Amino acid sequence: MAGRATATATAAGKDRSSFAVTCSLLSQFLKEKKGGGGGLQGLGLGLRPAPAAPPAAGAGGAFRPPPTTMNLLSGLDAPAVEVEPNTAETAADELPLIKAPADQQSDESASEAAGEKAQQLTIFYGGKVVVFENFPSTKVKDLLQIVSTGDGVDKNTGTAATQSLPRPAHNSLPDLPIARRNSLHRFLEKRKGRMNANAPYQANCTAAPSKQANGDKSWLGFGQEMTIKQEI
């Protein structure tokens, strides 16, 4: 029993001696760190020293609040967030595509140029020529459908019949000499008839033979009167 008591006493003495050595080392370490970091703050335990007491208003002049410290390097300890490429592509695809007004106008003008090409349209109707500038090709089909419902239009080909249209003015030019010739003949016939019917010398000629015929026959009547008187 006595041996056990002595063993426990020696173990307790060793523990006390080791604790004392640890405390002495800690106090020495704090003394060394007091000049650089100061106390427990240099150990990295996150402890800050107590703020200093504000000086009296009359001793150093105006009252100044204690300086505040800001930890600007706190974001370096946070782990970096990595973005997967698949999620970035899907997010870009989900965004709505907005076109500028200039792009929309260029697309519309290109579609109009491809679908509706304006050309010159010439129509011959009623001896007149009508010309339309920049007439869209899509409206030509509508115009042919409207014209095809008429009577003087061939429904199979969609073109107007040439028989119903009057002759153009330039086709009557070769007929002008013939018309002049006919009018000249009519004028000569009228003048010839007038000369034969109303000429004064023809009237005198016709009157002279009638007088001569009457004079030749007068003696015949005188002879008859003489024979009648002799018989009486």
From Swiss-Prot:
Motif interval(s): Jas: 177-202
Domain (Tify) ranges: 114-149
Pfam families xrefs: Jas_motif, tify
Motif stretch (Nuclear localization signal): 179-186
GO cellular component, one term: nucleus
Post-translational note: Ubiquitinated. Increase in jasmonoyl isoleucine (JA-Ile) levels mediates its degradation via COI1B-mediated proteasome pathway.
Entry text on domains: The jas domain (177-202) is required for interaction with COI1.
The organism's place on the tree of life at top rank: Eukaryota
Any one biological process term the GO annotation gives: defense response
InterPro entries, sorted: CCT_CS, TIFY/JAZ, Tify_dom
Upper lineage: Eukaryota, Viridiplantae, Streptophyta, Embryophyta, Tracheophyta
Signal peptide: none
Comment field (misc): Plants over-expressing a truncated form of TIFY10C/JAZ8 display a jasmonate-insensitive phenotype and have altered expression of jasmonate-responsive genes.
Induction record: By jasmonate, and cold, drought and salt stresses. Down-regulated by abscisic acid (ABA). Induced by wounding. Induced by blue light.
Spans annotated as Disordered: 54-73, 152-177
The entry's keywords: Cytoplasm, Jasmonic acid signaling pathway, Nucleus, Plant defense, Transcription, Transcription regulation, Ubl conjugation
Assembly: Interacts with BHLH148. Interacts with COI1B in a coronatine-dependent manner. Coronatine is an analog of jasmonoyl isoleucine (JA-Ile). Interacts with TIFY5/JAZ2, TIFY6B/JAZ4, TIFY9/JAZ5, TIFY11A, TIFY11D/JAZ12, TIFY11G/JAZ15 and NINJA1.
Organism encoding this protein: Oryza sativa subsp. japonica
Protein's job: Repressor of jasmonate (JA) responses. Acts as a repressor of JA-induced resistance to the bacterial blight pathogen Xanthomonas oryzae pv. oryzae (Xoo). Regulates JA-induced accumulation of linalool at the transcriptional level of linalool synthase gene LIS. Linalool is important for resistance to bacterial blight pathogen Xoo.
Biased composition (Polar residues): 156-165
Record-stated family: Belongs to the TIFY/JAZ family.
Subcellular localization: Nucleus; Cytoplasm, Cytosol
Protein name per the record: Protein TIFY 10c
